[in-house]
Amino acid sequence: MPEALNENVSDTASNGPVAKTRAPPNTSFRQQRIKSWQPLLTPKIVLPLFFVLGIIFGPLGGGLLYASSIVQELVVDYTDCETLASYDEFSAVPSKKYTASFDQSGTIGFDKESTYWKLEKILDKDLDMDVNYCIIRFTVPSVLKAPIFIYYRLTNFFQNHRRYAKSVDEKQLQGVALTADEVKGGNCFPLEVNEDDKPYYPCGLIANSLFNDTFSSLRLLDDNSVYTFSTKNIAWASDKRRFLKTNYSPDDVAPPPNWVLRYPDGYTESNMPDLSTMENLQVWMRTAGLPTFSKLAMRNDNDDIFPGTYEIKIGLFFPVKSFDGTKSLVLTTRSVLGGKNPFLGIAYIVVSAVCVVLGTVFTLRHFIRPRKLADHRYLNWDSEENNLAPHLSDRP
């Protein structure tokens, strides 16, 4: 009887359902049996590697540094123009307020201290009011090859703050006419609707803080000719796709608080903003990752700037002193690698130097006090085992 019972149990076990298992399939990849190769890092391999890296990174760093050095650039910090400049006459811009990186080869009599500014009140016809303009006069000693770009640079402005960066409604930017309740339920807090419960268009902190200083084209004083810049094609194609013409009617929405100066009577059929064509807004809405950043304001892709003395007028609207920031004008050319930024080239050269120094030090160490490969005297576990051996032999 017990034998029959055992037979039934074994039959049931063999014929029953197979138990589920969480073991991975029996493959080379899943069972980690794929063939591998691990290099043996001997001095003959590691030491030449240091020198090879130094030889590679050195010329690369030199090339990057050269590409940055050929970019011609003028940077003027005009934050204090309203307090330091005069309404009566031009005065020299303090040297700490500007940097000029021009090609001066073959230039005779170029004065590095040739940047001046002056304040002037000019009637803004759109605003119907007098506006302070900072007029900056500077000298270009050599030809600036097109394309030429004008950027504005801000410091201590944290566009990467979480509340600021998320304060935008993508549907509204795509032209969807959201109701007040829909805007309140979105991401535009704290600038969603006005006191009349009208949605702000565009809503959110990013749009409200749009950089609104204005830049004129350059005027050459020698012959009073104008070097014209354009505000077209300053936004990336990916940024342009974020914005479409709105389906709002002017009476349904209100301008953001910081836009009221430009739209004192609200939106009308004639001044309703079309975000799909406002490239300055599109550029601004791409938030910067660092508190110091530059954004493209204007460009000229065809005409060179010839040597001479130029003037540019900047309408002063954007406040920066409230957050201890600065604002600067950047007039620049570019190289195949972009604008002037020596950091990457310097970093490559430093890495190259470090590799060569380490390679030299380790090579000298290897020749002065060579170490035998696979010397068992350096195995800690081996020495510990030998130390324990006498004690283990004493055990009963």
From Swiss-Prot:
<feature type="disulfide bond">
    <location>
        <begin position="81"/>
        <end position="134"/>
    </location>
</feature>
<feature type="transmembrane region" description="Helical">
    <location>
        <begin position="342"/>
        <end position="362"/>
    </location>
</feature>
<dbReference type="GO" id="GO:0016887">
    <property type="term" value="F:ATP hydrolysis activity"/>
</dbReference>
<keyword id="KW-1015">Disulfide bond</keyword>
<dbReference type="Pfam" id="PF03381">
    <property type="entry name" value="CDC50"/>
</dbReference>
<feature type="transmembrane region" description="Helical">
    <location>
        <begin position="131"/>
        <end position="151"/>
    </location>
</feature>
<feature type="region of interest" description="Disordered">
    <location>
        <begin position="1"/>
        <end position="30"/>
    </location>
</feature>
<dbReference type="GO" id="GO:0005770">
    <property type="term" value="C:late endosome"/>
</dbReference>
<dbReference type="GO" id="GO:0005783">
    <property type="term" value="C:endoplasmic reticulum"/>
</dbReference>
<keyword id="KW-0256">Endoplasmic reticulum</keyword>
<feature type="transmembrane region" description="Helical">
    <location>
        <begin position="45"/>
        <end position="65"/>
    </location>
</feature>
<dbReference type="GO" id="GO:0045332">
    <property type="term" value="P:phospholipid translocation"/>
</dbReference>
<keyword id="KW-0469">Meiosis</keyword>
<dbReference type="GO" id="GO:0005886">
    <property type="term" value="C:plasma membrane"/>
</dbReference>
<dbReference type="GO" id="GO:0005789">
    <property type="term" value="C:endoplasmic reticulum membrane"/>
</dbReference>
<dbReference type="GO" id="GO:1990531">
    <property type="term" value="C:phospholipid-translocating ATPase complex"/>
</dbReference>
<keyword id="KW-0812">Transmembrane</keyword>
<dbReference type="InterPro" id="IPR005045">
    <property type="entry name" value="CDC50/LEM3_fam"/>
</dbReference>
<keyword id="KW-1133">Transmembrane helix</keyword>
<keyword id="KW-0472">Membrane</keyword>
<comment type="similarity">
    <text>Belongs to the CDC50/LEM3 family.</text>
</comment>
<protein>
    <recommendedName>
        <fullName>Phospholipid-transporting ATPase accessory subunit mug89</fullName>
    </recommendedName>
</protein>
<dbReference type="GO" id="GO:0051321">
    <property type="term" value="P:meiotic cell cycle"/>
</dbReference>
<dbReference type="GO" id="GO:0005794">
    <property type="term" value="C:Golgi apparatus"/>
</dbReference>
<feature type="disulfide bond">
    <location>
        <begin position="188"/>
        <end position="203"/>
    </location>
</feature>
<comment type="function">
    <text>Accessory component of a P4-ATPase flippase complex which catalyzes the hydrolysis of ATP coupled to the transport of aminophospholipids from the lumenal to the cytosolic leaflet of membranes and ensures the maintenance of asymmetric distribution of phospholipids.</text>
</comment>
